[in-house]
Amino acid sequence: MTTASIKKRDPRRRLLPWLIVAFVALIGLAMIPALFRHDSTLQIRASRQGVSLPDGFYVYQTLSAQGIHIQSITPEQDSLVIRFDSPEQSYAAERVLRKLFAQSFDIAHQPGPGAASWINRISLLPQFVG
């Protein structure tokens, strides 16, 4: 009787490691798009005190009129962050915005998601370099 019960449990025990491997593989496949994301961001800040940020809708209209596709525009810590689908669109937008806002605003590229952003997401304390 014990051999019969052991034979019934063997297929389950053999199946469990394969289910775990399949689960880990599915999680890995779900994470691939986040690892190979190529979006690019620009940050607009006021270059001196007393200058207010430009309206996000105005920036959107201006860049759209130039044929530049924008993923999103969000205000973040006294700045305006604009996300684009590709670095080419980001550089084209930078040229347009530098002409438009001349000396009033600082326009800079933000670094893409790297190790520091992953560490900050899982850490209790933010990590800073420099």
Curated annotation (Swiss-Prot):
Domain of life (superkingdom): Bacteria
Pfam short name (any one): SecD-TM1
Any one GO MF annotation of this record: protein kinase binding
Chief place of localization: membrane
Intervals, Periplasmic compartment: 37-130
Cytoplasmic side, ranges: 1-15
Topology term for the membrane: Single-pass membrane protein
Keywords: Cell inner membrane, Cell membrane, Membrane, Transmembrane, Transmembrane helix
Transmembrane segments: 16-36
GO cellular component, one term: plasma membrane
Localisation per UniProt entry: Cell inner membrane
UniProt subunit comment: Interacts with EnvZ.
Primary role: Modulates the activity of the EnvZ/OmpR two-component regulatory system, probably by directly modulating EnvZ enzymatic activity and increasing stability of phosphorylated OmpR.
Family label: Belongs to the MzrA family.
Protein name in UniProt: Modulator protein MzrA
Organism: Erwinia amylovora (strain CFBP1430)
